[in-house]
């Protein structure tokens, strides 16, 4: 029993009579081992010389968990036996790499299960985290040995712990910033009200006319009349003088108010008229 009897694969493309030999189907049927011969034949429709053999015993079923590695390794074995030589170093390295990657994937799937720690392990991890939030490889190895865990599990726990600490600190900062924003909003509203009140007061202020001091002075004739009237009053009754203060300075030519009335006759002194 040779290799050709255990694995007969065929692919025929053609027009006209099938080039398959007559003893092809008989050789396949005479083999007593498991059939591993998936066959595909393309020809003209209605050709009676082509027969497609199908059967449940001709299918090779493999488990899903080992399909990748087994198919790859079997393919390499078939190629090596067909070529009649040994694999090159590059091919051997590729085969080992695929197998190692497969085993790593299996370990990764098993490692994805949630790790349940005891109270003692959790307490020791918390104490270690308080001392050092990050661990170097040596500290990681020592701690993993103490906890009877793998270094990768210790590293993942520290990563998750740092993430939770950062999240809590972010929440605290967010609450503080919210309070600051509320305080600033209230202060802004208060300042806006004060500005509005100041604008209202500015618009409702009474109108005052600014009069310069020169407009409150008397002409020379009025000054003479006022001075003469005060002199005629003499030592009789006391006369009071009222000074008009404009812009912090006394106006020139203060108005004199005498205690006794003085009557002026313009006909007797025509030059005294203004």
UniProtKB/Swiss-Prot annotation:
Record SUPFAM superfamilies = Homeodomain-like (SSF46689)
Q: Which Pfam families match?
A: HALZ, Homeodomain
- What are the record keywords, sorted? DNA-binding, Homeobox, Nucleus, Transcription, Transcription regulation
**CDD domains recorded for this chain?**
homeodomain (cd00086)
Could you tell me where this protein is found in the cell? Nucleus
Q: Where is this region: Disordered?
A: 64-96
Q: Mind telling me which GO cellular component terms the entry cites?
A: nucleus
Residue spans binding DNA: 110-169
The similarity annotation says: Belongs to the HD-ZIP homeobox family. Class II subfamily.
Source lineage: Eukaryota, Viridiplantae, Streptophyta, Embryophyta, Tracheophyta
Name the InterPro entries on file: HD, HD-ZIP_Homeobox_LZ_Class_II, Homeobox_CS, Homeodomain-like_sf, Leu_zip_homeo
Q: Which PROSITE patterns match?
A: HOMEOBOX_1, HOMEOBOX_2
Q: Where is this region: Leucine-zipper?
A: 177-198
Q: Where is the composition biased (Low complexity)?
A: 64-74
- Gene Ontology terms for molecular function: DNA-binding transcription factor activity; DNA-binding transcription factor activity, RNA polymerase II-specific; sequence-specific DNA binding
Record's protein name: Homeobox-leucine zipper protein HAT9
Described by its record, this protein's role is as follows: Probable transcription factor.
